[in-house]
Design a protein with these regions (language model features):
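Residues in soluble alpha-helical coiled-coils and helical-bundle/repeat scaffolds
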Residues: 5-9, 31-35, 52-53, 70, ...
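Hydrophobic/aromatic-rich alpha-helical bundle segments in the mid-to-C-terminal region
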Residues: 76-80, 84, 98-145
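Amphipathic alpha-helical packing segments from all-alpha helical-bundle domains
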Residues: 20, 56-61, 73-100, 111
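Hydrophobic recognition helices of helix-based DNA-binding modules
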Residues: 14, 18, 22, 26, ...
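Helix-loop "lid/cap" segments that line or gate small-molecule binding pockets
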Residues: 29-30, 45-53, 60-71, 142-150
Length: 151
């Protein structure tokens, strides 16, 4: 049954079953051993793999969720929570890497993390349209490279 035909509670459960594991996987990658650059790369592999992995079901679910969020507070809160968790996890990695001198000097970790999440969300649109000019893996690698000191 399409998400738009389900009860709001059931549709949110479906959303949670797909989104929460992605957030948890990014959290594991962010907290793994390794340098901030390695952890950032792993976290982005998870995020871009999930969002750009040609899963039309996930893409449709999130795109539908964004539309519902305009009129449904529960969707708005759920999707805001998910986005903020991802942003904060990435921000923590970026901030640590900047302090340790691995990432660009003066890096605005919060703004860069938000840009990364936005780029990943753009992959959902590409997945819905059967791909884009730049693969999610290439985009992920480019974003990591842009954060590195000396890039």
């Amino acid at each position: 049954m399409p998400a738009s035909m389900e009860s709001p509670g059931a549709a949110l459960e479906v959303l949670d079953k797909r989104i929460v594991p992605i957030v948890e996987a990014v959290a594991r990658a962010a907290r793994d051993a390794g340098s901030p650059a390695v952890r950032l790369e792993r976290a982005l592999e998870v995020l871009f793999g999930a969002y750009g992995g040609s899963d039309p079901g996930l893409s449709a679910l999130l795109l539908e969720g964004w539309v519902r969020a305009q009129r449904d507070k529960q969707y708005r809160l759920r999707l805001a929570w998910q986005r903020e968790q991802l942003r904060l996890l990435l921000q923590d990695i970026l901030a640590e890497g900047a302090v340790r001198g691995l990432f660009r000097s003066g890096l605005d970790a919060g703004a860069v993390a938000a840009a990364i999440v936005s780029a990943a969300e753009g992959c959902l649109l590409q997945a819905a349209m059967q791909g884009g000019a730049v693969s999610p893996a290439e985009l992920s690698r480019a974003l990591v490279a842009l954060t590195l000191r000396g890039a």
